[in-house]
C-alpha cells in the first residue's frame, strides 16, 4: 500500500479539493494507494527541537503497523484510537464541513479533537471517491485482499508436483478453508456463519480439462469485508501436475 503525501501547494482545503483530480492514479495503482491531508508539525531534532512542517507518510505507516498488530489488517487504521503519536500539531485544523468536502473525493483527513488529540479520520484508497464506486474503496478492504492474495498464493505452492485431480482440489479446499475460517473467527469478515463470510472453490468447474492439460489449477476465494454474503472475489492460479525432474 502506497501512502501518498499531500502536495506542498495544498495549504488549504480548497487547494486539496481542486488538486485531487490531478493526482493521475487509476486502476490498481489507485486501489493500492491512499492519500492523507494535511501535513503535520513535529519537533525537528536537527534544529534543536524547533517545530517544523513534515509530510505525514511516516506517522501514517506507524498507525497502520500499530493497528495491524493490535487489531489485524482488516481493521481500518482510522478513528479515535488511530492517534498520531508524537505529532505536535497539524498544518491545518479542519472542521467537519471541510472534512465532508474532501472525504467523498478519497482524501483522508487528519483531524484534531478535544481530549483525543490528533487522529487519522479517513480510510479510503485513491479509488475511494464516491463517484468511482470501486469495490476497493476502503483501505482495510484492499489491504485485506492483498494479504489474502499473498498468503493463499504462498500457501498453495506445494501443489506443483501433485496430480491435478479431485483429491488435490479437495485438499486445497480443506487447507484454504481452515485458513479462512481462522480469520473469520478473528473477526476479519462480516457474517455470523462461515457461508456468509467466505468461500473457497476449487473443483472441475474452476479447473477444466483444458486447464489440466496445461498443468494449471484454478482457485476462487471470496470474502465478505463489509456486509454478509457480499463477496469480494480473489482468483488464484498455480501450476500443478508437473513431473519432478
What residue ranges belong to the model's regions?
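Structured, hydrophobic secondary-structure cores that serve as assembly/anchoring elements
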Residues: 1-245
